[in-house]
């Protein structure tokens, strides 16, 4: 995931989860109910800290404010692919010229590349690849437009109530929005999948191209790069 002031980052812990949007830092922590703990100081415009098991809200700041979710959108893309494709992720993906035309950040796929859908998904999460997100959308649902509809259905199933996803990558688009509460609910829902947990935690990944030399990439998430506790 991209960790820039104009984008959003995600960091998960097993039991405690915090989601913040746009210019925020997201981190996992533990909470003791036996003693008073002062509310954390945060520069994020919107923040939610929840227990990922019980969905109890432990801390909130503007939890339902509409925000642009930026690259956290790819979390929904991953979850939607897992929900819809299940065990069919070993199929070779078709790479379109439209997918390769996306603005950065990108995984670097090319038309004609031979790579499984799972390989594209993994690369999408590690490199925050906008091109890979489009490849996922087109191969899962036939088009970006159809995939966006599927994203919204999956997000609602996960508990999101105030989100509209119009693309799989998170590039700015009018009407594409979410909230800190919704992203927290979506992330907590996704954590039930082992594959989801694995793919949001990778530091390095060797992209398994079958038609050219596999390429090793590193995550754009500086929390994972710097071994921040709970980031993986």
Stretch-by-stretch model annotation:
Residues 1-11:
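N-terminal secretory signal peptides that target proteins for export/translocation
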């Amino acid at each position: 995931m991209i960790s820039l002031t104009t984008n959003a980052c995600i960091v998960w812990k097993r039991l405690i989860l915090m989601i913040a949007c746009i210019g925020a830092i997201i981190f996992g922590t533990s909470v003791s109910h036996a003693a008073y703990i002062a509310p954390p100081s945060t520069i994020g415009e919107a923040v939610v800290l929840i227990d990922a098991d019980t969905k109890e809200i432990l801390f909130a700041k503007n939890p339902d404010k509409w925000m642009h979710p930026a690259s956290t959108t790819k979390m929904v893309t991953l979850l939607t692919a897992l929900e819809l494709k299940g065990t069919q992720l070993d199929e070779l993906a078709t790479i379109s010229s439209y997918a390769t035309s996306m603005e950065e950040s990108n995984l670097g796929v090319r038309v004609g590349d031979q790579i499984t859908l799972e390989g594209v998904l993994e690369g999408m999460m590690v490199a925050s690849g906008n091109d890979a997100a489009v490849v996922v959308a087109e191969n899962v649902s036939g088009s970006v437009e159809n995939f966006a509809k599927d994203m919204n259905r999956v997000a609602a199933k996960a508990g999101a109530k105030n989100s509209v996803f119009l693309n799989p990558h998170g590039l700015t688009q009018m009407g594409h929005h979410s909230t800190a509460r919704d992203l927290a609910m979506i992330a907590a829902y996704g954590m039930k999948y082992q594959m989801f947990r694995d793919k949001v935690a990778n530091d390095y990944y060797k992209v398994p191209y079958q038609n050219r030399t596999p390429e090793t990439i590193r995550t754009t998430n500086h929390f994972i790069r710097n071994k921040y506790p709970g980031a993986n």
